[in-house]
Amino acid sequence: MNNVIVDCEIEDGNIVDVSLELLTKGRSLADLLNVQLDAVIIGKELKGIEQQVYPFGVDNVYVAEDSRLYPYETLPHASIVSKLFKEIKPEIALFGATSIGRDLAPRIASALKCGLTADCTSLEIGEHEDKKKKKTYKDLLFQIRPAFG
């Protein structure tokens, strides 16, 4: 499907602020790429949780609900997200720079044999011209992150 997807973290039955911020950025990236914005929410007692993400322009919500899925545990969450991503094949996946996101995102990238950039401060869609090959690559994701030293 090549959509943009955001892994939404929950705390006390609510989507955490960092996930809402990522949904906002995800919506702008999805609009630039002319694709849909998806959200994945994993936890327990999630009835109506999708109502918290729809105001951010989410097109599809994937919910995995079970009493054993909250609080966060690495292996069950990684298994669920990996299987979902293999099925829907997102073009871009956004995870918060939280303890959960820093645990989950590299596991997903490893399982799917794909790239990962951490600690981005900005994400932009653009193009790159390879002058040697005389080829222009469009709709590239530029990941801006701080560089030290």
Language-model segment annotations:
Residues 1-149:
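N-terminal glycine-rich FAD/FM-binding segment characteristic of electron-transfer flavoproteins
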